[in-house]
């Protein structure tokens, strides 16, 4: 499995305000700066830990523009 990536610092507080999806994890949609988006992203401990059923995280920290709650 791919390494986890840190969520940009400016989005940590936003995600922390979302309801938990499961045991401290948050389910979000990640929006990238180029307009692409990824549903079913799991954030835990300020890190992207899973993207859908993928074994890789298909974006980098620098590409993340925003997150939307999907809990």
Feature roles, as predicted:
Residues 1-71:
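Motif-centric detector for short Cys/His coordination patterns
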């Amino acid at each position: 499995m791919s390494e986890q990536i840190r969520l940009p610092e400016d989005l940590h507080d936003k995600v922390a305000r979302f309801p938990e999806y499961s045991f401290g994890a948050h389910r979000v949609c990640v929006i990238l700066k180029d307009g692409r988006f990824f549903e079913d992203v799991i954030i835990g401990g300020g890190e992207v830990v899973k993207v859908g059923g993928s074994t890789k995280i298909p974006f980098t920290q620098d590409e993340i523009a925003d997150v939307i709650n999907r809990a």
